[in-house]
Amino acid sequence: MKKQNNLRSLAAQAVEQVVEQGQSLSNVLPPLQQKVADKDKALLQELCFGVLRTLSQLEWLINKLMSRPMTGKQRTVHYLIMVGFYQLLYTRVPPHAALAETVEGAVSIKRPQLKGLINGVLRQFQRQQETLLNEFATSDARFLHPGWLVKRLQNAYPTQWQHIIEANNQRPPMWLRVNRTHHTRDGWLGLLEDAGMKGYPHPDYPDAVRLETPAPVHALPGFAEGWVTVQDASAQKCVAFLAPQNGEHILDLCAAPGGKTTHILEAAPEADVLAVDVDEQRLSRIYDNLKRLGMKATVKQGDGRYPAQWCDEQQFDRILLDAPCSATGVIRRHPDIKWLRRDRDIAELAKLQAEILDTVWPRLKPGGTLVYATCSVLPEENSAQINAFLQRTPDAALSETGTPDQPGQQNLPGAEEGDGFFYAKLIKK
């Protein structure tokens, strides 16, 4: 492998772009993976996800072992040392190889003069590892979450916040949704077994399958033909609450990448579905999913706050609003969220959610159903949001989900092995 494609230096650059520049790992990682051999892609992904998952600990260690922070053009070395710590703590990479490759990464980022520094810090960590980890275990950094988020979770869930944090720090299972228009779930599980893999049906979600071991999608029976889709079990519950019917006019708002759009059409193949998302670049993901599953829907770019951008005065039988949110329920799947979000974002997101709810509600027919969903665990975006909406919207009533005192249903991360999700089913009187 060429030196400029040193895995450790690429991982360091990816983490730096997330933490320092506010870019999402899903945007940063794919171009970097193109620079390494296929056999190395999984390790590069593991290093990036792992460092972001444990960033608080790795930062704490650097502060203990270095007298001053690295700044300016040397900042990438800061993250390269983190990659070294992560390998020594959490991977099966032999320590000598972890050190050698991490030190060599300095050459790839054109900082060869710092090889000795990197080597010295990593070896010092090896010598002091037990003492350092014992001290870390009593520090605030041990939660592996930013302090503002820990405080919000403590306030919202006084008896459950530690369980939420522990779930967020775990690796997520791989959930699939079997396309019922092609196969029964049991039938597809048989095909999976024939392919040498094992899956488990979810007891409550009729299309959901959890893989015993995560696998690349191209290895899944019939993935290219649309027999199965990658989607967390908790996300599949949105369409169960929506209960779409054939012949209905249905709006999927904030629809990208299209997982719920296609789920609606699997449940009601003859429904007339309009999928709308504000991000024009992500519309291609909706088209790709529709094409792979052999389905048709109308797809438009538009802001949920301005319905005139994407439809005329028509009303819908059902609306699924998967609202823009903090994504604090899917941290285990996207650990970069911890470092991309800021405390001030929550109030801004809650304001945006309220605006979308208020402007889309008139587009729902009397007697129609609106399902409001987020992948957040914060009450400001969930139960408090719906409570405020019900108070200012006389023709809205809660159905199936929660009580007037606690509107909506909150799934916490790890519950039934799913992501953290919130749902509120509203009926228009």
UniProtKB/Swiss-Prot annotation:
Cross-referenced InterPro entries: MeTrfase_RsmB-F_NOP2_cat (IPR049560), MeTrfase_RsmB-F_NOP2_dom (IPR001678), NusB-like_sf (IPR035926), NusB_RsmB_TIM44 (IPR006027), RCMT (IPR023267), rRNA_ssu_MeTfrase_B (IPR004573), rRNA_ssu_MeTfrase_B_ent (IPR023541), RsmB-like_ferredoxin (IPR054728)
Annotated active site: 375
Q: Which Pfam families match?
A: Methyltr_RsmB-F, NusB, RsmF-B_ferredox
**HAMAP family according to UniProt:** 16SrRNA_methyltr_B (MF_01856)
Give the first-level EC class, as a single word: transferase
Keywords carried by this UniProt record = Cytoplasm, Methyltransferase, RNA-binding, rRNA processing, S-adenosyl-L-methionine, Transferase
Q: Where in the cell is it found?
A: Cytoplasm
Q: Does the keyword Transmembrane apply?
A: no
A GO molecular function for this record?
A: RNA binding
Query: Where, by residue number, does S-adenosyl-L-methionine bind?
Result: 254-260, 277, 303, 322
Q: What is this protein called?
A: Ribosomal RNA small subunit methyltransferase B
> So what does this thing catalyse?
cytidine(967) in 16S rRNA + S-adenosyl-L-methionine = 5-methylcytidine(967) in 16S rRNA + S-adenosyl-L-homocysteine + H(+)
EC number(s) on record? Answer: 2.1.1.176
Query: A biological process (GO) annotation for this entry?
Result: rRNA base methylation
Q: Supply the CDD domains for this chain.
A: AdoMet_MTases, Methyltransferase_Sun
Function in brief:
Specifically methylates the cytosine at position 967 (m5C967) of 16S rRNA.
Q: Which domain of life is it from?
A: Bacteria
| Protein family | Belongs to the class I-like SAM-binding methyltransferase superfamily. RsmB/NOP family.
Q: Which organism is it from?
A: Salmonella arizonae (strain ATCC BAA-731 / CDC346-86 / RSK2980)
PROSITE patterns associated with the record:
NOL1_NOP2_SUN, SAM_MT_RSMB_NOP
GO CC terms on record?
cytosol
